Amino acid sequence: MAKTHEIKVERRADEGKGASRRLRHAGVIPAIVYGGELEPVSIQLNHEQIWLAQQNEWFYSSILDLNLNGDVQQVLLRDMQRHPFKQLIMHIDFQRVSANEKLSASVPLHFINEASSPAGKSSEVVVTHELNEVQVVCLPKDLPEFIEIDLSTLEVGAVIHLSEITLPAGVEIPELKLGKEHDVAVVIAKHGQVEADDVADEAAEGDAK
């Protein structure tokens, strides 16, 4: 089970663009929490606290405990609006999760032992990570903070597909149920010369058009 992280929030009394603008000037982020059998609730969060939290991977992929005056609700981050050029978070959406209902979430992929693998030891091999995250379905208690992929045995020319990822108990990748064409490559270990030839072929095709 992934570690949970508590974030203290307050109920937001005033709504609208003017009220939200005043909150942001005061170092506060307007937000909303929705979902489940409860009504949506307008809340506000400390900008400094969230700015630090959002620099961590867990903020985007873990269950968060929203503490509203002692009332703790488990949520997932669903949307975060940022200012186009300032270091400013404009608004956040959180969705409540139910312990007995499966949820869909994006989970980061962590690749380990690449350098010590046969492919990683070769200076002539290019290892590419085609995916850095994957969409999963599971109960909240089973949601992993990340999924680890061990590349220690990765050989030259090998391809690791989505179906080959070792998943934690209770976790599924729904895309794999859509057919073999959705079993996409996650890691490719390609000989550098092969990649160079591919680039040359693409360039030649472009010149021919």
Curated annotation (Swiss-Prot):
Q: Cellular component per GO?
A: cytosolic large ribosomal subunit
Q: Which organism is it from?
A: Xanthomonas campestris pv. campestris (strain B100)
Listed disulfide bonds for this chain? Answer: none
Family membership, please give it: Belongs to the bacterial ribosomal protein bL25 family. CTC subfamily.
One GO BP on record is: translation
Name the InterPro entries on file: Rbsml_bL25/Gln-tRNA_synth_N (IPR020056), Ribosomal_bL25/Gln-tRNA_synth (IPR011035), Ribosomal_bL25_b-dom (IPR020057), Ribosomal_bL25_C (IPR037121), Ribosomal_bL25_long (IPR001021), Ribosomal_bL25_short (IPR020055), Ribosomal_L25_dom (IPR029751), Ribosomal_uL5_bac-type (IPR020930)
Q: Which domain of life is it from?
A: Bacteria
Identify this protein by name: Large ribosomal subunit protein bL25
